[in-house]
Amino acid sequence: MATMVAGISLRGPVMSSHRTFSVTKRASLPQSKLSSELSFVTSQLSGLKISSTHFISSSAPLSVPFKPSLQPVARRICPFTGKKSNRANKVSHSNHKTKKLQFVNLQYKRIWWEAGKRYVKLRLSTKAIKTIEKNGLDAVAKKAGIDLSKK
């Protein structure tokens, strides 16, 4: 059997019948078929812009400067007193120490704000609630630097 390698015909195995297989010249593809395939590819890409001078002349930076994201809303910190979680040791009977967190006793509390003539819902520690009852909401908020009109 004859095989085709790079356009050259090879003779098959020579046995009792000395047959030779010759391969005729390969017919080239017609130009119209090639151009139609090319136009199909270009029509698929017709909506895309490959290059543009609009971005080159622009003086605006390509990257956006990094802005840190907003802090999480439900942090375990009292905004009025600044109390945070305490890292303590959990001590077993065998005196084996492991770290644990002692959280602040935070409570959601709706407090009447006299200057604003409305209720303000705050997340406060129990110590801050006692301080507000003693000194007043305006005095404690002013000392902590908190604007109650945004709450």
UniProtKB/Swiss-Prot annotation:
Main location: plastid
GO terms, biological process: translation
Keyword match Plastid: yes
Entries under InterPro entries matching the protein: Ribosomal_bL28, Ribosomal_bL28/bL31-like_sf, Ribosomal_bL28_bact-type, Ribosomal_bL28_sf
NCBIfam families for this protein: L28
UniProt superkingdom: Eukaryota
UniProt KW keywords: Chloroplast, Plastid, Ribonucleoprotein, Ribosomal protein, Transit peptide
Organelle transit peptide: 1-74
GO CC annotations, alphabetized: chloroplast; ribonucleoprotein complex; ribosome
GO molecular function: structural constituent of ribosome
Entries under Pfam families matching the protein: Ribosomal_L28
Species: Nicotiana tabacum
Subcellular localization, as worded in the UniProt entry: Plastid, Chloroplast
Gene responsible for this protein: RPL28
Family: Belongs to the bacterial ribosomal protein bL28 family.
Subunit structure, interactors included: Part of the 50S ribosomal subunit.
Cystine crosslinks: none
Protein name: Large ribosomal subunit protein bL28c
UniProt entry tagged with the keyword Signal: no
